[in-house]
Amino acid sequence: MNTVFPDSVIAAFIAKMQKKKVIYYGHSTMEDFKNSFIGSNLAAPIFKKWICFCYNLGDVVVTPTEYSRKLLEGYGLKRKIYSITNGVDTEFFKPDPEGRIRFRAKYQLTEEQKVVISVGHLIGRKGILDFLELARMMPKVQFIWFGGGNESLVTAEIKEAISKKPDNVLFAGFVKSDELRDAYCGADVFSFMSYEETEGIVVLEALACEIPTIVRNIPVYEGWLEDEKQVYKAETIKEFQEKITAIFSRDVRLMKKEERKIACNKSLGKVGEQLLRLYFEME
């Protein structure tokens, strides 16, 4: 079961009636539900109870990281919890010089123009407000945000901030996977300012494409992403500005190799091997 929607719950009950083992994927937590849309903070405690009910329908629970595993253990789940990465398609997401050309042509960017991108829904948790403030602090840099969301669920604060965005910010909306890959290959920095993640699939995609990446220094990255080895980490908007400025002038070739190495260790093939071992354990 891969979602916490009612159809997955029904499917889990049917599987149990048929004496089948159920693996429930624990991608959602109360922590990453908060600050997501209008009313999400009020609904968060109810959401926590619901996902606990869902996850306990599984014989085991699989969650992407050690961080999310510890969160779910703290919920008092009755099932054994395994941490297995979401993984990334490293055959698709990989460095591509032609992708850089396509990206810059599409958005009418010169080869010399510095470009910072981010990817995510237009929600507070993803750091959209900080992204806009960062752009104001770096007016000579082009900032592009990929992703959108249901406009009726976007908070008034974010709508107002977007309406007053600085001129160097472009909201590209949702794009196809190949266009997003071109963006990873064509921009200078991937700035992921999210406050809470269970892993961050877009981070894996960025690492696979070897774009210099800066993330917020939050617990989910502990143990697998090191500051100034595979990524840069920052806490304040000022730190993001300073480190991005430094990236523009640094030789990042060694870091790119480390990025790709991390991504390859989380390739879909590696994920498949881990899942296969789990399946055999359950027999």
What are these regions (language model features)?
Residues K21-I23, E31-C54:
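Nucleotide-sugar donor phosphate/pyrophosphate-binding loop at the beta->alpha transition
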Residues Y67, G87:
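Carbohydrate-associated surface elements
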Residues V88, V119, Q142-E157:
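Glycosyltransferase donor-sugar binding loop
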Residues T155-D178:
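Nucleotide-activated donor-binding/catalytic signature segment of Leloir-type glycosyltransferases, i.e.
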Residues F174-V175, D182-A187:
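Short alpha-helical donor nucleotide-sugar binding micro-motif in glycosyltransferases
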Residues Y195:
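Aromatic "clamp/platform" in nucleotide-sugar-dependent glycosyltransferases that forms part
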Residues P212-V215:
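Short hydrophobic beta-strand element within catalytic cores of glycosyltransferases
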Residues D227-K238, A246-D251:
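Conserved acidic donor-binding segment of nucleotide-sugar-dependent glycosyltransferases
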